[in-house]
């Protein structure tokens, strides 16, 4: 409960540390749903799973999806490909999936196509999918409502390094910086740290423009 920004409850109630400390628990499965429908799926999956598991979900309301269907058993460590396009991949965890989809729609209108992945799991990661993205995209942007240190983006970076792909693709990590977060309205705080649709759109666009500049800039020849 209260995974992520929870400023309405006071600055000591933000749930920003859980990804980092839960990743260190051996053999645990750690997950976060994109909405209330997937939350039911994850609760069902945790009940059926033979092993330790943890799920984070945010304070507040759902996004309004239909929850009348029977819950679905999810494959542990399997992400969901929400959108497949272009040379950019936005890999979002939990509450950041829907803002990432909105950002991708806006980017598409400007000619920047982006794949969007609902990571679902931070442990275990969907290594086959993430490594495939690293080999086929030129930019991966991870988005999480948690501290960057030891978080979801760090887990992805570790995976790329372990497979020798850290220099194959540009990785940009979006999340909460290394500072104490004040009390405040969650929507305003998320916007302040660039973790809403506008912030994700701006960061992806800036990153693409930077890569384009590097691609067109003449390379120096050292004799």
Feature-to-residue mapping (PLM):
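Thiamine diphosphate
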Residues: 2-15, 48-223
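Short active-site oxyanion
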Residues: 28-30, 88-89
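Internal gly/pro-rich beta-alpha loop/helix module
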Residues: 8-26, 32, 36-47
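A structural motif
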Residues: 27-28, 52
């Amino acid at each position: 409960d209260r995974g992520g920004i929870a400023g309405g409850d006071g600055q000591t109630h933000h749930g920003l540390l859980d990804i980092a400390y839960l990743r260190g628990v051996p053999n645990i499965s750690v997950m976060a749903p994109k909405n209330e429908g997937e939350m039911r799926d994850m609760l069902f999956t945790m009940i059926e799973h033979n092993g330790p598991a943890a799920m984070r979900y945010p304070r507040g309301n759902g996004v309004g999806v239909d929850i009348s269907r029977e819950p679905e058993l999810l494959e542990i460590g399997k992400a969901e490909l929400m959108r497949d396009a272009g040379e950019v991949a936005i890999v979002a965890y939990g509450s950041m999936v829907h803002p990432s989809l909105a950002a991708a729609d806006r980017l598409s209108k400007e000619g920047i196509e982006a794949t969007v992945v609902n990571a679902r799991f931070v442990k275990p990661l969907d290594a086959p999918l993430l490594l495939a993205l690293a080999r086929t995209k030129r930019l991966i942007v991870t988005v999480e409502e948690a501290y960057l240190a030891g978080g979801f983006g760090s887990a992805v970076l570790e995976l790329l390094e372990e497979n020798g792909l850290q220099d194959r693709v540009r990785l940009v990590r979006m999340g909460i910086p290394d500072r104490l977060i004040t009390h405040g309205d969650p929507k305003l705080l998320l916007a302040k740290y660039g973790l809403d649709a506008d912030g994700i759109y701006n960061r992806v666009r800036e990153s693409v423009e930077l890569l384009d500049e590097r691609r067109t800039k003449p390379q120096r020849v050292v004799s």
